Amino acid sequence: MPRPTTSSPSQRMLRVAEQVRHALSETLQRGEIIDPLIENTVVSVSEVRMSPDLRVATAFVSPLGAKDTDAVVEALNKHAKFVRGRVSGALRQMKFMPEFRFKLDTSFDNFARINDLLKSPEVARDLDADDDKTKDDRAKDDKDSE
């Protein structure tokens, strides 16, 4: 009987993903991949998502200081089998070593966009108006309590 599919990852998937993220970060930090694009770039692994069968690991990476981030991600995908072999030593407890897929992490860009929106004059004006209302409400409550 097939299991019902859920949208949220299981506890095991989360635990394994975190172990894979640590092992992958250590491998990239040691600089074992011989590729000019990757050697000259610091690559941050922000998240790893595992497939339900734990055979595919999608790593979300942020190439820091790289001009062409897509080229760095493409180079990582090109060297995915090499990375898989290097990470396998740290993940000996796994029955199957996952296949690695690298994707560009856009969460930092989204954070910056939201931060810019929050700092915009329109939002600041609305927040100031809300602050004025709450101050007026507090002053009114203080007068009522006296």
Swiss-Prot record:
GO terms for cellular component: cytosol. Gene3D superfamilies: 3.30.300.20. SUPFAM superfamilies: Ribosome-binding factor A, RbfA. InterPro entries: KH_dom-like_a/b, RbfA, RbfA_dom_sf, Ribosome-bd_factorA_CS. Keywords: Cytoplasm, Ribosome biogenesis. The keyword Cytoplasm applies. It comes from the Bacteria. PROSITE patterns: RBFA (PS01319). GO terms for molecular function: ribosomal small subunit binding. Residues 125-146 are annotated as: Disordered. It is found in: Cytoplasm. Disulfide bonds: none annotated. GO terms for biological process: maturation of SSU-rRNA. Monomer. Binds 30S ribosomal subunits, but not 50S ribosomal subunits or 70S ribosomes. One of several proteins that assist in the late maturation steps of the functional core of the 30S ribosomal subunit. Associates with free 30S ribosomal subunits (but not with 30S subunits that are part of 70S ribosomes or polysomes). Required for efficient processing of 16S rRNA. May interact with the 5'-terminal helix region of 16S rRNA. Belongs to the RbfA family. HAMAP family: RbfA (MF_00003). This is Ribosome-binding factor A. It comes from Mesorhizobium japonicum (strain LMG 29417 / CECT 9101 / MAFF 303099) (Mesorhizobium loti (strain MAFF 303099)).
